[in-house]
Amino acid sequence: MDMFVIHGGRRLRGRVRISGAKNAALPIMAACLAADGPVRLRDVPALADVDTMTQLLESLGMSIRHELPADPPGAGLSGPVEECECGAESWDEFSAAAHCADHGPGSAAVLFDSPAANPLQTPPLRLEVVDEAECVAHYDLVRRMRASICVLGPLLARRGRACVSLPGGCAIGDRPVDLHLKGLAALGADLKIERGYIWARARRLKGARIYLGGAFGSTVTGTCNVMTAATLAEGTTHIEAAACEPEVVDLGNFLNRMGARISGLGTPFLQIEGVDRLVGAEHVVLPDRIEAGTLMLAAAITNGDVVLDNIRLEHLTAVVETLRGMGVTIEEFGEAIRVMVRGDLRPLDCIMLPYPGLPTDLQAQMMALLCTVPGISIITDKVFPDRFMHVAEWCRVGASRRREGASAIINGTAHLSGASVMASDLRASAALVLAALAARGDSVVRRIYHLDRGYDRLEYKLKDLGAAILRTVDHPHNLPAGLQVSSQELPPQEVPGSELRGPKWLRRGDFKLVTPEEE
C-alpha cells in the first residue's frame, strides 16, 4: 500500500482544473448497458472506482477502451514517486527544499491570467455492448464500491434478468438498498435476495407511480437505478421524492441524449415516458463538485490563493456561502472561481443536508478547516448521522473535538501538529490530507487507496498549487525523520532520594533495615 508524506505549512497558490464527477460517471457508465450502440464519454476521471466499474462492465459483455492513447504526467494512481522539480530525491531533501523558489508556482504572474496549463484530462472513453449473455455481477467486483448496484436497473430493463451481489463501499453508516428494490418491484420486477445476491427477473417492465423517500431523504443511487430502468418500461413512470443532485440530472440528460423521455430533472418529481430502445450517444461528464469543494477548503485551510477551472457554480452555492460566512474571499468569473484568505476566519455551525444543502461528502473536509479556526464550531450530519469514524484521528494532529449523536463539537486551534494518521474512508482521507497541509512539520497519511477511489490524481493537483506532498510505499523506512520516535529521546526519570518511601510494614517499625556498619 501507498501513503502520502506531506510537509505542512505552505500556502497553496496557483490554478488547477476540476475533473469529471465520480458520482455522475459511474451511473452513466452503468447505464450504457441499456444502450443499443456505442457510447462516447468525455471527462471521465481517472479513479480506482472507474477502473472497478470498467472491469465489472467488461465482465457483463461490454467493450471499453480509451479512444486516444495518452499518458499525461502522473497518470498512474500508484507506483514510483517522481523526483521533485527542485531536484530532491529523498523526503528529507524534499522537505528542506520545500520553500525553494523553483518548487511549485513561485509567482502570481502566471496564476490567474490563463486556464490551468496541465489539466490532466483523460482521453474519451468508448463503451459498447458486444455480448448480452452474462447477467451476473459477481461479489469480487461489486464489493469494492457501492455504485456497482447501478448495473441492476439497466441489466433488468435491457436483458430481462440480473443477478447482482449486494454492494460494498465506504463504511460511513447505514445505506440499505431497500428503496432500489421497492422501485424496481413497482415496475413489475420479480426480486429476491439469496446467498448475498439480488436476483431479478422481468419480461418487460411496466410504468408505475413510485415513492423513493427514505428515513434520511431521497436515495441518489436508487433514483439512478429506477430512472434508468423506467426508460425502457412500457408506459409512463412517475417518481416522487426523487433525488435532485446534479449527478442525477447529468445521468438524466445522458439518457435523454440516447432517446429517453425524462422530464422534471432537478426536481423531486420525475416523469419518464418509456421507449423501445436507447441508442448510442456522446456525453461530457459534469465537473466534480466534491473535488471542487475539497480544493476550495484546501485553499482556505492553508490561507492560500487558488483559481479552480471547470466549475459549475450553481452546484456549489451552499459551499460558497458557507465559506464566505467564515471570512473566505471568493471571486466568480465564468466557469472559474478564485478562493483567497485575507484575514482571520470565524468559527460557525453547519448542517450537512441533501442537495442543495451542504453535501455530506464535504463533512470531514469542513471539520478539518474548522479545527484550524479558533473558537467553538458544530457540524451536524443529517444525511449520514454515523459518518464520524474519522473523528478519532483528529486528536493525533492536536485537534480538540468530541462527538454527540449526529453532531461533532470542535474547539478550533490556530496550529495543528504533524503526525501519522490513517484514513477510514474516501472523504476522511481527503480531510486528513487537508489537515496535514495546514499542520506544522511533517505528516503521514496512510490507507490512501481510499482517496484513489474518488479523487483524480489529487497529489499532482496539490503539487501544481505548491504543496509539498509525496506518494511512497507505506514502510517505516519511508517515514520522515521528524516522525521517527526513539526511546533514546526519553530522558531517564530522576527522583530525589528524599521522595522515596519504604513499604508500610517498614514504616510501622515491625522490621528494621540493618546497615553494614551496624553489623
Regions found by a protein language model. Name each.
Residues M1-S95, H99-E519:
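Short, structured segments at the rim of ligand-binding sites
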